């Protein structure tokens, strides 16, 4: 009986997800599971020389904290799964 109980306890621990992992977009359609300690999804946008004809450049990803904002760069941060979609694909 003790062996059965021990086996059930071990299986429960193995099957449980003991830590929450965040999922963030890394491109318009692809997402990844963030590394431990990366608790924020971000979407960074900025203009380059072709901004008028091609639109803003975009960078997606995971981070431990929201990246610093520099002049001319817009950053949006969030902390739920896939919360950083491409601006044109938002509901």
From Swiss-Prot:
Disulfide bond residue pairs: 24-41, 34-62, 47-51, 66-77, 78-83
Pfam name, any one: Toxin_cobra-type
Keywords attached to this entry: Acetylcholine receptor inhibiting toxin, Disulfide bond, Ion channel impairing toxin, Neurotoxin, Postsynaptic neurotoxin, Secreted, Signal, Toxin
Signal peptide bounds: 1-21
GO molecular function ontology, one term from the record: toxin activity
Keyword Disulfide bond: yes
UniProt cross-references to PROSITE patterns, sorted A to Z: SNAKE_TOXIN (PS00272)
Subcellular localization(s) per the UniProt record: Secreted
Expression by tissue: Expressed by the venom gland.
The protein's role, per its UniProt record: Binds with high affinity to muscular (alpha-1/CHRNA1) and neuronal (alpha-7/CHRNA7) nicotinic acetylcholine receptor (nAChR) and inhibits acetylcholine from binding to the receptor, thereby impairing neuromuscular and neuronal transmission.
Family according to the record: Belongs to the three-finger toxin family. Long-chain subfamily. Type II alpha-neurotoxin sub-subfamily.
The protein's name in its UniProt record: Long neurotoxin LNTX28
């Amino acid at each position: 009986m003790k062996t059965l109980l021990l086996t059930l306890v071990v299986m429960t621990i193995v099957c449980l997800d003991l830590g929450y992992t965040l999922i963030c977009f890394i491109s318009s359609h692809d997402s990844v599971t963030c590394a431990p300690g990366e608790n924020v999804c971000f979407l960074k946008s900025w203009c380059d020389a072709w901004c008028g004809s091609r639109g803003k450049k975009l960078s997606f990803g995971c981070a431990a904290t929201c990246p610093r904002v520099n002049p001319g760069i817009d950053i949006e941060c969030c902390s739920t799964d896939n919360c950083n979609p491409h601006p044109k694909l938002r509901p």
